[in-house]
From Swiss-Prot:
It comes from Myxococcus xanthus (strain DK1622). Signal peptide: none annotated. It comes from the Bacteria. One of its GO terms (molecular function) is ATP binding. HAMAP family: ATP_synth_epsil_bac (MF_00530). The gene is atpC. It is a peripheral membrane protein. This is ATP synthase epsilon chain. Produces ATP from ADP in the presence of a proton gradient across the membrane.
C-alpha cells in the first residue's frame, strides 16, 4: 500500500519527516484529510492539531498556522511553529491566555498591542484545543 511522506518544517528547523497512511490537516476552511494519491493543491493552515495516522496509530502535532502543500504522495507543512501535542503544558497555556486577556482589558481595539494580545489568546486557545483533542 502506498504511503505519504509527511514533513513539518518551521523557520527554525525540520520538525518531522515520516511515512503515514493519512494526514488530517487544520486547513483554512476546516479539517481535511490527505491520503496517498490525493490531488495536488496548496492551502492555508489555521492553528490547530495536525494528526498523522500510521497503521491505526495516531500522532498529533500543534501547528501555529502556515501553509500545506500536497502533491505526489507528499505533504509538506510549512508552519510558523510546531510541537508535539504531548509536550503542551495546558496549564501554562491557560495562564498565558488569561494574562493576555487581562492585558487586553485596559486597551482600545485600536492599540497596536491589542492585536498581539488577541493573537496570543487565539494561539493558546488553539494549543489547548489541540492538546485536549489528542488526549480524548
Amino acid at each position: 500500500m502506498a504511503k505519504l511522506t509527511v514533513e513539518i518544517v518551521t523557520p527554525e528547523k525540520r520538525i518531522l519527516s515520516v511515512q503515514a497512511d493519512e494526514a488530517i490537516v487544520p486547513g483554512g476552511r476546516g479539517l481535511f484529510g490527505v491520503r496517498p494519491g490525493h490531488t495536488p493543491f496548496l492551502s492555508l493552515m489555521e492553528p490547530g492539531a495536525l494528526t498523522l495516522i500510521e497503521s491505526g496509530r495516531r500522532e498529533s502535532y500543534f501547528v501555529a498556522g502556515g501553509f500545506v502543500e500536497v502533491g505526489n504522495d507528499k505533504v509538506l507543512v510549512l508552519a510558523d511553529a510546531a510541537e508535539p501535542v504531548t509536550g503542551i503544558d495546558v496549564e501554562g497555556a491557560r495562564r498565558r491566555m488569561a494574562e493576555a486577556q487581562e492585558r487586553m482589558k485596559g486597551m482600545s481595539s485600536e492599540d497596536a498591542r491589542f492585536e498581539l494580545e488577541q493573537a496570543t489568546v487565539r494561539r493558546e486557545a488553539a494549543r489547548i484545543g489541540a492538546a485536549n483533542t489528542a488526549r480524548a
